[in-house]
């Protein structure tokens, strides 16, 4: 073998037990999937920052890449938010060519973000992609940032549901939401509303009314960790009316029957969900008992 060749030889047993020499490409590229957190640079983990610093190529949705400063010798590959699998395939191709790639998401890359798209593309892609070293670095997702700002609303059992029907039918969304409401989870709603989907949050909150008291605390947490951060603690009844004020930067959190608020003079109330739970009057297969 030419000593300058980028290929190396490995030996495997074939099905008959014979020894056969095979050639496999040397792996020089890598792919790291990171989350930048919800906003402030202080919430980017050191591991995620190190991956960004080491990358030759950054791949992601344009607004997320805009949060990363330009640097000589590093290339940004921006794309639209509706081409996640195509974006992931592009990142894998770059890594296969020997580039050190960071796929950039907001929040946590494994929560309604790019990590799943990368593995979907990997499974469907060519076999040579399987030798690419892939690392997923965790990040702070929006529901954790919002919960920290409010107090401890996720102190009990909770779940997260995306209201977007871009990747799944709306009847799947409503079926999951209905089950979560009937089980009395605290429910974190991602992607609550967009220009193309202006009605879905209102529909979700109307559904919640069938399973929760009107005074149930609901958080509207917008752009947490950014200069335009806004956190509102509403009742469920108020939230139904305010649904149109949310946008894609808003995380909506519907409390459980046990979720409480602590009023404060001149400041937003604290919201928390106790860890201890007695039998809930709301947990039925049909909603209210």
Identify the meaning behind each predicted range.
Residues 99-104, 152-163, 181-185, 237-248:
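A polyampholytic, Gly/Pro-enriched intrinsically disordered region
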Residues 34-35, 103-106, 137, 161-164, ...:
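Short beta-strand segments
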Residues 1-4, 10-18, 24:
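A cross-taxon signal for low-complexity, glycine/charged-rich
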Residues 23, 111-183:
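Class I SAM-dependent methyltransferase SAM-binding "motif I" and its flanking Rossmann-like core
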